[in-house]
């Protein structure tokens, strides 16, 4: 998802979501009432309509209060991503094995939301 490509955590207001990898590169997702925006260290990457995301069945589900499991079901991208709430407010961190995994996540987002 330039992605949470993330319905990324609770769609009840504005949230910032950080996808961190070992070298601390980060993609930030700002969730608004009707869209969410991906940025990489303040560089604009993409913007998506929340309705489009919420209409993708089976891709996101809440696993417990404040947590979200992203599950890609296409064989090409058969991975699970667990997003866990950190101690700071409205922030979610996705732990990945290496930078290539983060790039894969970005590609998944493009596939899902840009066709």
What are these regions (language model features)?
Residues 1-33, 92, 97, 111, ...:
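Anionic N-terminal interaction surfaces
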Residues 2-4, 49, 78, 87:
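A generic structural signal for short, non-catalytic loop/turn and secondary-structure boundary residues
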Residues 17, 42-44, 99:
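Short, solvent-exposed aromatic-acidic interface loops
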Residues 21-24, 28, 32-70:
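Phosphoinositide-binding peripheral membrane targeting modules
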Residues 54-115:
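Acidic, Ser/Thr- and proline-rich intrinsically disordered linker/docking segments
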């Amino acid at each position: 998802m330039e992605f949470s490509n993330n319905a990324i955590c609770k769609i009840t207001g504005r949230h910032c979501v950080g996808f961190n990898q070992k070298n601390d590169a980060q993609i930030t997702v700002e969730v608004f009432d009707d869209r969410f925006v991906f940025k990489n260290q303040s560089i604009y990457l993409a913007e998506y309509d929340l309705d489009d995301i919420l209409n993708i069945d089976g891709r996101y589900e809440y696993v417990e209060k404040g947590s979200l499991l992203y599950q890609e079901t296409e064989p090409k991208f058969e991975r699970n991503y667990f997003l866990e709430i950190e101690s700071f407010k409205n922030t979610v961190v996705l732990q990945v094995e290496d930078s290539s995994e983060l790039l894969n996540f970005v590609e998944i987002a493009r596939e899902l939301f840009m066709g």
